[in-house]
Amino acid sequence: MAKDASLIEANGELKVFIDQNLSPGKGVVSLVAVHPSTVNTLGKQLLPKTFGQSNVNITQQVVIGTPQRPAASNTIVVGSPHTPNTHFVSQNQTSDSSPWSAGKRNRKGEKNGKGLRHFSMKVCEKVQRKGTTSYNEVADELVAEFSAADNHILPNESAYDQKNIRRRVYDALNVLMAMNIISKEKKEIKWIGLPTNSAQECQNLEVERQRRLERIKQKQSQLQELILQQIAFKNLVQRNRQAEQQARRPPPPNSVIHLPFIIVNTSRKTVIDCSISNDKFEYLFNFDNTFEIHDDIEVLKRMGMACGLESGNCSAEDLKVARSLVPKALEPYVTEMAQGSIGGVFVTTTGSTSNGTRLSASDLSNGADGMLATSSNGSQYSGSRVETPVSYVGEDDDDDDDFNENDEED
């Protein structure tokens, strides 16, 4: 048919007609589509022939390549208005399925807040506001927020969006952890803080350094206190054992004070009101004058059981004895304490007037096996484990129902 209409030459080339009525500089190329079966070889380049006057100047000879056409009969060739590429679109597809409409839809979705950047900001805000949270908590809240905003979405699309949101939340949490903005321990997520500049970071590190130095000092003080307690207890045990060997009998029961204990010291003229709970686990003392409280460790120190390490006045012989009472790893600390570097470890406090000092049974109950011979020298100051309770004399408070008055004075 094409040959009959003189559209194809005998050698199979395609004729191209140029409108002779237009100006020479604006040649118009007219392309006539031919059924693929009439063309022998696909991909063969066709050189068009021009018909017209010889004196007409044509700007450029056009070379047309025959594209690969699909085998389906219901397809048409669509040319992009922006690019020279050729796209094959089925006639059964809607116009929204074109690549340009898909790109618009993707950009619109990103603007609606479905991008990783937007999710990262949302996740960061929620973790910062909560302080401590979990992945499920953040993901559930974001799913609820976006589901409420998209009520018109179909159920199957909503399920897909929920999975997408949870995946985005998981990715955002990993990004924030990599940037050290949040920390994760098992299922618990904690807020650390946004990155700061170098000056602020240096200041924060200096504050953290001072805080850790203070903790180290506190730990050193606790260690030295425990070393003194161990030395004092072991010295007391050795002294009691020697006393039993010399007497060849155990001491009388009424001469033994069990550890731990406390001693309350006050004037003979002080009026003391002591109330004891029904279970005898709590004691309430009311004093009308100043008083002092000493614990067992302070009494042992004043008896010389700590070998003078508490004050830094330790002789070479006492140092040797003290080093033998502690493990090998603690011997350097004992030597350091003997040289006087223990200053400031123990707090020396004095008693004061009190009204309503409450003592628990743990301070008065029988504890470690050990016997103590009391010293005749009275103590005026206390360096106990805890600071002395301080209060002032005031009006007498009504006794609680669970206390029984005991008028005995110590």
UniProtKB/Swiss-Prot annotation:
Feature: compositional bias, Acidic residues:
394-410
- Renumbered to this chain, region (Enhances binding of RB protein to E2F) spans 211-327
Gene Ontology biological-process entries? anoikis; epidermis development; negative regulation of fat cell proliferation; positive regulation of DNA-templated transcription; positive regulation of G1/S transition of mitotic cell cycle; positive regulation of transcription by RNA polymerase II; regulation of DNA biosynthetic process; regulation of DNA-templated transcription
What are the UniProt keywords, alphabetically? Acetylation, Activator, Cell cycle, Cytoplasm, DNA-binding, Nucleus, Phosphoprotein, Transcription, Transcription regulation, Ubl conjugation
What segments bear the compositional bias annotation Polar residues? 79-100, 373-385
Give the record's PTM text.
Ubiquitinated by the BCR(KBTBD5) complex, leading to its subsequent degradation.
Q: Where is this region: Disordered?
A: 79-114, 370-410
Q: What terms describe the molecular function in GO for this protein?
A: cis-regulatory region sequence-specific DNA binding; DNA-binding transcription activator activity, RNA polymerase II-specific; DNA-binding transcription factor activity; DNA-binding transcription factor binding; protein domain specific binding; RNA polymerase II transcription regulatory region sequence-specific DNA binding
This protein's GO cellular component annotations are: cytoplasm; cytosol; nucleoplasm; nucleus; Rb-E2F complex; RNA polymerase II transcription regulator complex; transcription regulator complex
**DNA binding happens at which residues?**
113-195
Q: Motif DEF box: residue span? A: 161-195
Keyword Kinase applies = no
- Positions of region (Interaction with CEBPA): 105-127
In the record, the note on similarity to other proteins reads:
Belongs to the E2F/DP family.
The protein in question is named Transcription factor Dp-1
Q: Which gene encodes it?
A: Tfdp1
